[in-house]
Amino acid sequence: EKQSKKIAKHIIISVPVWDYYKPKKELALKAYQVLKEVKADSGLIIFHPFRYHKDSDMWYYAPHFHVIGFGWVENVVETYQKYGYIIKNLGKRETLFGTIYYQLSHCGIKKHNHSLVYFGDCSYSKLIVEEEEQESKKCPHCKEYLQELECNTNYNLKPDPNIMEPWYMAKS
């Protein structure tokens, strides 16, 4: 099923305190597992190591993930009871660009780590890039298709550079 038929949702996955000591890679693997359980099977994920405390105007360590996910978010209570990860479905956003832009504006950045990672059907391994057909070049005067010529440098002739630049000639 194409992802374009599903509605993108903003989901937050908060890591339980007992997993705070784990490296980001382990936390991300668990987050993907949690996403599968709640049926958010593809999208993008952004890691945030800190949260902002308004009253103290300070950032504190509280790792969590922001997800723009496709699929139905269900089994949240059961998944929480199983893993301890809190899943918040913030639903459809007014603008995906604005949501992603804001989340990237204060995400965790670390050398050799991507700030934004695609997963599921949105992952790079599932991306199919179709080659574009090149537009055929036609002669501006006779409208015939042009054919490529090989340049023979054995002659000392100096042709007009305007003619030789593209090295094309109409088929006869």
Q: PLM features: what roles do these ranges have?
A:
Residues E1-Y61, F70-S172:
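Right-hand nucleic-acid polymerase module
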